[in-house]
Amino acid sequence: MRQKFEKSPDLFTIPISVTKFHSNCRDEAPKLLKGLQTIFMDEELNESIFLLLSDRINNKRAALIKSGRTGMGLWEILVLCVMRQGLNANYDRIHYLANSDTIMRSIMGIESESNLAVDRKQYGLTTIKDNVALLDEQTLNEINAIVVGYGHRLLKKKKKRFG
């Protein structure tokens, strides 16, 4: 069974909640990553999305568990999939970002402050393809509906506060 997120990362792993973004960047990637950071930090949103992911992905991967590989965590799969869809990127670009972009790696929960090449978790292209393929269009649409509902609730709260 895949884990939601690695519960006890090493001492040098940068926490997702403290990831900093460039404030004046107009690229789409930081906006997507900020959204993912919000999903990770909001308990209610996090729980509902991971419940859905766990149900869909863990059921599909039963056959590969026999191979002895633990596979990526649900959070890593979600981040890779959202970035691929949101940037309309091919697998080669996602492979590059997952292994080289420090902010994306920090949101994935795998970036270390030590920056030693030996310590850095790396993903193979085939690993990314196999894991991202586990999220089908229906699951992504359901996740989208959950996130949009969350956004609507935030707007209602904001209107009540200022209205």
Residue ranges and their predicted role:
Residues L78-N88:
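Alpha-helical support elements that line or immediately flank enzyme active sites
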Residues Q37-V79:
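Basic, short loop/linker segments at the boundary and entry of helix-turn-helix/winged-helix-like folds
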Residues I94-I110, G151:
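DNA-recognition alpha helix
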Residues M1-L51:
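Charged, often Cys/His-bearing segments associated with DNA-binding zinc-finger transcription factors
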Residues Y91:
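Helix-turn-helix DNA-binding elements, focusing on the entry/boundary residues of the two helices
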Residues T70, E76, A98-N99, K121, ...:
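Non-catalytic DNA-binding core/recognition domains of DNA-processing enzymes
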Residues E111-G163:
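Active-site- or DNA-interface-adjacent structural scaffold in DNA-acting proteins
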Residues K66-R69, M83, G109-A117:
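Catalytic micro-motifs at enzyme active sites that drive phosphoryl/nucleotidyl and oxygen chemistry
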